[in-house]
UniProtKB/Swiss-Prot annotation:
Gene Ontology CC annotations of this record: cytosolic large ribosomal subunit
Classification via Pfam families: Ribosomal_L27A
Taxon lineage: Bacteria, Pseudomonadati, Spirochaetota, Spirochaetia, Spirochaetales
Protein name (record): Large ribosomal subunit protein uL15
Family, as annotated: Belongs to the universal ribosomal protein uL15 family.
Complex and partners: Part of the 50S ribosomal subunit.
GO MF term set: rRNA binding; structural constituent of ribosome
Taxonomic superkingdom: Bacteria
Amino acid sequence: MFSLLKPKGAAKRRKIVGRGPGSGLGKTSGRGQKGQKARNTSPRLGFEGGQTPLYRRLPRKGFSNNDYKLEYAIVNLGDIDKKFNDGQVVNYDTLLENKLIRKKNKKIKILSNGKLTKKVSLEVSKISKTAESLVMKIGGTIKLV
């Protein structure tokens, strides 16, 4: 096992530059003669040789309000019917326990997909009108938090 050799070409030798003409990479170290690429540092990203760069030629445009956008975790009445019993409270913590929402969503919106047959008391951020009427018809309660 310790006498195994690497296949040919698997381990490349490191380039040692600037160590005399006999090495093949002496004097200019494989960088050619003069010019920007022969110098020590390369120009910064977006630099176009002194010409006004593209990012300054084009106007700034647009606006995004995504950082302040409210995102709701959507829960359907059918899902609540499957996971909850009569008289139970449906809020952020109980929905999290039953894995109907993920942790990152703090706001909950209830939609009317599916059938609700159990009386539950909802403590949510938002609820659709049809979902609200279905919950009230059964005799459940709604508290907007």
